[in-house]
Amino acid sequence: MPRKGPAPKRPLVNDPVYGSQLVTQLVNKVLLDGKKSLAERIVYGALEQARDKTGTDPVVTLKRALDNVKPALEVRSRRVGGATYQVPVEVRPDRSVTLALRWLVSFSKARREKTMVERLANEILDASNGLGAAVKRREDTHKMAEANRAFAHYRW
């Protein structure tokens, strides 16, 4: 275990095109094998497609999508006397954004459209309208937390 304590959080730079930290986080979630320029091309292309389809600011569409995907509760495993309980806990705001972006990107990859730009754009649009696999994942997470409410007193 490290003796110095947790590593300090590094500040995120605003994205150069939209001036948004959310877009920077999305680029970092799409990033694979250090190919940042490719990740930026995918994200900017997806946001352009979203703007063309909705006619509104793509960052506003992305924020609306994230609000529909961000979980408020999740379950965490807690071992008590030989049994493992799924204990519902509230999700910290920064973690909820991270989870929402992770779900958006992972469910984009699973879609059937031809290019990743189309997949990401359509997943963002679906999520902003309350549809799509990422929103379903949030609902499933909330259902799990609700089903395990009896173990809420094991919170830590």
Swiss-Prot record:
Q: Which InterPro entries does the record cross-reference, listed alphabetically?
A: Ribosomal_uS7 (IPR000235), Ribosomal_uS7_bac/org-type (IPR005717), Ribosomal_uS7_CS (IPR020606), Ribosomal_uS7_dom (IPR023798), Ribosomal_uS7_dom_sf (IPR036823)
UniProt GO cellular component terms: small ribosomal subunit
Arranged from A to Z, the UniProt key words for this protein are: Ribonucleoprotein, Ribosomal protein, RNA-binding, rRNA-binding, tRNA-binding
Question: What GO molecular function terms would the record report?
Answer: rRNA binding; structural constituent of ribosome; tRNA binding
Does this entry carry the keyword RNA-binding? yes
Q: Cytoplasm as a keyword? A: no
Q: Mind listing the GO biological process terms from this record?
A: translation
Highest taxon above the source species: Bacteria
> What does the subunit section of this Swiss-Prot or TrEMBL entry state?
Part of the 30S ribosomal subunit. Contacts proteins S9 and S11.
What family is this?
Answer: Belongs to the universal ribosomal protein uS7 family.
Give a short account of what the protein does. Answer: One of the primary rRNA binding proteins, it binds directly to 16S rRNA where it nucleates assembly of the head domain of the 30S subunit. Is located at the subunit interface close to the decoding center, probably blocks exit of the E-site tRNA.
Q: What is this protein called?
A: Small ribosomal subunit protein uS7
Organism source for this protein?
Mycobacterium sp. (strain KMS)
